[in-house]
């Protein structure tokens, strides 16, 4: 068996407007599909950034993770050209970031920030 690549990653968010503002308007994802699913009482968004697809289920009644170190998805990481410049851009959009760190395993700069539902997101050179 040979797996070619990751096709998509799925996250669950609570608020449609916040999700669109954050992922589309601020982070630059494109909406490729949007479906309101009455049977599941949610909205399914398929977003794209480069070759990567992010599938988002907007479920207003979804519980939040109590803390990030639970079993399952820990965080999403995005590769960027320049962490320092990206941090400035995020901060200008009103998105708080942690201090920039040096990843001793990769030899690259990186830091974290959170989406509106507190999902940790990483930028990494």
Where are the regions that the model predicts?
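Short hydrophobic/aromatic beta-strand micro-patches
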Residues: 10-12, 77-79
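Vicinal oxygen chelate
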Residues: 1-5, 30-77, 88-114
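Conserved beta-strand-loop-alpha-helix junction that forms the acyl-donor binding cleft
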Residues: 13-15, 38-39
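Short, conserved charged micro-motifs
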Residues: 83-87
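Conserved active-site tyrosine of GNAT-family acetyltransferases
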Residues: 19-24, 90, 118
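Short beta->alpha transition motifs characteristic of CBS
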Residues: 12, 33, 123-125
């Amino acid at each position: 068996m040979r797996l070619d690549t990751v096709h998509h990653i799925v996250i669950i968010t609570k608020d449609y407007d916040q999700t669109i503002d954050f992922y589309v308007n601020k982070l630059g994802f494109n909406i490729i599909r949007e479906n309101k699913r009455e049977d599941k009482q949610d909205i399914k968004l398929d977003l794209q950034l480069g070759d990567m697809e992010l599938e988002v289920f907007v479920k207003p009644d979804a519980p939040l993770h109590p803390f990030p170190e639970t079993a399952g998805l820990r965080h999403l990481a995005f590769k960027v050209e320049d962490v320092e410049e990206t941090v400035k851009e995020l901060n200008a959009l009103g998105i708080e970031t942690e201090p920039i760190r040096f990843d001793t395993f990769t030899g690259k700069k990186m830091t974290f920030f959170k989406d509106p539902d507190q999902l940790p997101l990483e930028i990494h050179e």
